[in-house]
From Swiss-Prot:
The lineage of its organism: Eukaryota, Metazoa, Chordata, Craniata, Vertebrata. PROSITE patterns: CAVEOLIN. It comes from Rattus norvegicus. Coiled coil: none annotated. Changing Y19A: Abolishes phosphorylation, insulin-stimulated interaction with phosphorylated MAPK1, MAPK1 nuclear translocation and activation, reduction of insulin-induced DNA binding of STAT3 but no effect on 'S-727' phosphorylation of STAT3. Phosphorylated on serine and tyrosine residues. CAV1 promotes phosphorylation on Ser-23 which targets the complex to the plasma membrane, lipid rafts and caveolae. Phosphorylation on Ser-36 appears to modulate mitosis in endothelial cells. Phosphorylation on both Tyr-19 and Tyr-27 is required for insulin-induced 'Ser-727' phosphorylation of STAT3 and its activation. Phosphorylation on Tyr-19 is required for insulin-induced phosphorylation of MAPK1 and DNA binding of STAT3. Tyrosine phosphorylation is induced by both EGF and insulin. InterPro entries: Caveolin (IPR001612), Caveolin_CS (IPR018361). It is found in: Nucleus; Cytoplasm; Golgi apparatus membrane; Cell membrane. This is Caveolin-2. GO terms for biological process: basement membrane organization; caveola assembly; cell differentiation; cell population proliferation; chemical synaptic transmission; endoplasmic reticulum organization; endothelial cell proliferation; insulin receptor signaling pathway. Residues 87-107 dip into the membrane without crossing it. May act as a scaffolding protein within caveolar membranes. Interacts directly with G-protein alpha subunits and can functionally regulate their activity. Acts as an accessory protein in conjunction with CAV1 in targeting to lipid rafts and driving caveolae formation. The Ser-36 phosphorylated form has a role in modulating mitosis in endothelial cells. Positive regulator of cellular mitogenesis of the MAPK signaling pathway. Required for the insulin-stimulated nuclear translocation and activation of MAPK1 and STAT3, and the subsequent regulation of cell cycle progression. In the retina, mainly expressed in vessels, but also diffuse expression in the inner and outer plexiform layers and in the inner nuclear layer. One of its GO terms (molecular function) is phosphoprotein binding.
Length: 162
């Protein structure tokens, strides 16, 4: 027993396939996964956002604008949608992903360490509470309801047409 003065020399060696991959992306080589054909919405969570120019702006056959106006409007719509989306994701995607990660981690921790133990404790205590509640019901509420029922059973009403 005493003060240790030696430095510990610890190194961790892991093969690339030794740890669990929770996502498809291999973070050791992200350039390998810059495939634009990859489906980033496999569960179709945002299928309602797949709108095009024709879904938003439509001219009936009787009223058409000039062809050049239609083509320029379509091009400007697509370019602005692309540029603004890229611009917003550059500034918002990482902070919002960080906030969402913190939020989900906090909710998971609260659920695992506070909510479920509380629910299990309540379910464990419930049989004795159920016995006490049945006794209170039999002793207090049962006779009270019986008395009120007998009082109202002796009431009679007669309707007469005048």
């Amino acid at each position: 027993m005493g003060l240790e003065t030696e430095k510990a020399d610890v190194q961790l060696f892991m093969a690339d396939d030794a740890y669990s991959h929770h996502s498809v992306v291999d973070y050791t080589d992200p350039e390998k996964y810059v495939d634009s054909s990859q489906d980033r919405d496999p569960h179709q969570l945002n299928s309602h956002l797949k709108l095009g120019f024709e879904d938003l702006i439509a001219e009936p056959p009787t009223t058409h604008s000039f062809d050049k106006v239609w083509i320029c409007s379509h091009a400007l719509f697509e370019i602005s949608k692309y540029v603004i989306y890229k611009f917003l994701t550059v500034f918002l995607a990482i902070p919002l992903a960080f906030i969402a990660g913190i939020l989900f981690a906090t909710l998971s921790c609260l659920h695992i360490w506070i909510l479920m133990p509380f629910v299990k404790t309540c379910l464990m205590v419930l049989p004795s509470v159920q016995t006490i509640w049945k006794s209170v019901t039999d002793v207090v509420i049962g006779p009270l309801c019986t008395s009120v029922g007998r009082i109202f059973s002796s009431v009679s009403m007669q309707l007469s047409h005048d």
